[in-house]
């Protein structure tokens, strides 16, 4: 059939959600599902003239009801064959019924006020009493406050001092006979920063030179002691022989000092190498401890899982995995013990 132009559009039904206490809700649900003809006798809704309060009777038991506005609009659908759904209404209100409520609440008489702002504010406060902050499901608790928060307004900050300073600068620029400007490139700033960093390097070199000078002073003292002792022993000999002996002792001392310096450098390098080895082995030990702890935790979880499983085939499979974890744990323990022995041997040296 073709729809004629004169046909009026289908109007949606007017619907709302009825929320009852649990014991009464189960009674109404069973009555609706059973399809009783006398459902009107068992359930009745009566609204007061204010349109917000009313009485809901379930099996002749009166319940106080209040009509509230939901935070959002929901669509109500119906179906005949459970395959195709048709929209029947937009639901935006809910009738909340309680046992301990007031069946006949006092009616608020309107007070005539000359100020329109005051009356407007009073109407707004009255509407807030019938605003429902929650949704229909539990995750939508306080949804009105969470999703409809008031946005922060940008406040205009008055700064008369800044405006006066800007005006003064503009007036001085206009009165100036000539102007001069200077451009500072980024490369120059980087060079100055590098120079500031290079200034600290002479201090480091001076520290090293001071350390070397202390070593040379000690060597000079040793040299002076040895030379003085050699002079005391050779007092009876001739002056020429003394000069020759002094020259020989100086050369020998220089060789000895050079050998000592070389030995100290080699010892320092060996110590540095040993420290690096110790740090590397310590790092390996820490990593191995972490792996061992992780393997032990996995084995513990596997044991708990085997205790809970009743299927024999599944339990055998889990047991095979547990055996592999135990073998892995033994290997990691051996590696950890070997690393600890190696570390102890290095520390003893």
UniProtKB/Swiss-Prot annotation:
It is found in: Nucleus. InterPro entries: TAF7, TAFII55_prot_cons_reg. GO terms for cellular component: MLL1 complex; transcription factor TFIID complex. One of its GO terms (biological process) is regulation of transcription by RNA polymerase II. Residues 244-349 form a coiled coil. Keywords: Coiled coil, Nucleus, Phosphoprotein, Transcription, Transcription regulation, Ubl conjugation. Residues 230-247 have a biased composition (Acidic residues). Residues 107-126, 185-212, 227-247 are annotated as: Disordered. Phosphorylated by CIITA. Phosphorylation at Ser-264 by TAF1 in early G1 phase disrupts binding to TAF1. Pfam families: TAFII55_N. The modification Phosphoserine is found at residues 171, 200-201, 213, 264. PANTHER family: TRANSCRIPTION INITIATION FACTOR TFIID 55 KD SUBUNIT-RELATED, TRANSCRIPTION INITIATION FACTOR TFIID SUBUNIT 7. Component of the TFIID basal transcription factor complex, composed of TATA-box-binding protein TBP, and a number of TBP-associated factors (TAFs), including TAF1, TAF2, TAF3, TAF4, TAF5, TAF6, TAF7, TAF8, TAF9, TAF10, TAF11, TAF12 and TAF13. Part of a TFIID-containing RNA polymerase II pre-initiation complex that is composed of TBP and at least GTF2A1, GTF2A2, GTF2E1, GTF2E2, GTF2F1, GTF2H2, GTF2H3, GTF2H4, GTF2H5, GTF2B, TCEA1, ERCC2, ERCC3, TAF1, TAF2, TAF3, TAF4, TAF5, TAF6, TAF7, TAF8, TAF9, TAF10, TAF11, TAF12 and TAF13. Interacts with TAF1; the interaction is direct. The TFIID basal transcription factor complex plays a major role in the initiation of RNA polymerase II (Pol II)-dependent transcription. TFIID recognizes and binds promoters with or without a TATA box via its subunit TBP, a TATA-box-binding protein, and promotes assembly of the pre-initiation complex (PIC). The TFIID complex consists of TBP and TBP-associated factors (TAFs), including TAF1, TAF2, TAF3, TAF4, TAF5, TAF6, TAF7, TAF8, TAF9, TAF10, TAF11, TAF12 and TAF13. TAF7 forms a promoter DNA binding subcomplex of TFIID, together with TAF1 and TAF2. Belongs to the TAF7 family. This is Transcription initiation factor TFIID subunit 7.
